């Protein structure tokens, strides 16, 4: 690359110059560092965003897909019947449950592996504990090239060692790029549908959202708080309460008459008592019990509708939020794949840099300093990525 002043940039910093001129707002332009792996909010894979996704998935894996599971999920006793109309809800929940189970068993481990790849690469470049990182060893190679101008054999060896280390780093960056592409592909399937990792057709969260919206409209029309049935149930409950109150009052009055029957004398009182007990009292008792049972059933149905539809509305909201977070996650993983490509290209530029160019560049220790600065950046991102992996399941 020829600059306006006629100077030629060495190959290993050409891409950095392009970054600097095209994006003057970039905080770091070291071509050997993890540029882009850190945003203004921290590590590129945000723990807060993924915690939300995990919460959604945890809910999804526990969705009820039959009457028995629904009763346990919302706390309905076995005496309460669940109409067949709700079977359409189970079908949608089953699709979502499969997606969420696939996420937990396959996709989320890939997300963690991507973060672990970043951490492993960072520690490989920067070192960890007593283990020297590649960049520090490459600094030694650069020094050996610079200090052995009189010994071409030593220079050539140092240059070949530097190229060999670059080759290893390039190979790993390319592997991690392919892995990030794989996550993006499967994440896209999770959101938009396709085939999962086992070759099964899945409809995706977007289609689940559409299906649930249709079911929601249908069930709201049949059982929602604005439905004719709901209004009828409310009126029925109100009428039954009034009727039950009247029956209980009549029952109490009759009980008083039974007790007062003995005022007629022992013999006549006993006869009147038996007649009342066998006829009126039993009749009113049965009426009270029947009214109470009917009222309980009506209240149970109202409770059932409120609980099941309430859960459905909550899931609908969760899906809306999940799609928003999922689209952001897809952008992140596509960006990570792109970053790995740039890292591979940058280290490739260094690998292709001639021995003479390194000698010239190292007159002001630029490459040596560049490697040291990049090592510090990689160590920082490696620790953040490691923290994400270690705390991924912590709410």
From Swiss-Prot:
The gene is cry6Ba. Endotoxin with nematicidal activity. This is Pesticidal crystal protein Cry6Ba. The lineage of its organism: Bacteria, Bacillati, Bacillota, Bacilli, Bacillales. One of its GO terms (molecular function) is toxin activity. The keyword Translocase does not apply. The keyword Transit peptide does not apply. Keywords: Sporulation, Toxin, Virulence. GO terms for biological process: sporulation resulting in formation of a cellular spore. It comes from the Bacteria.
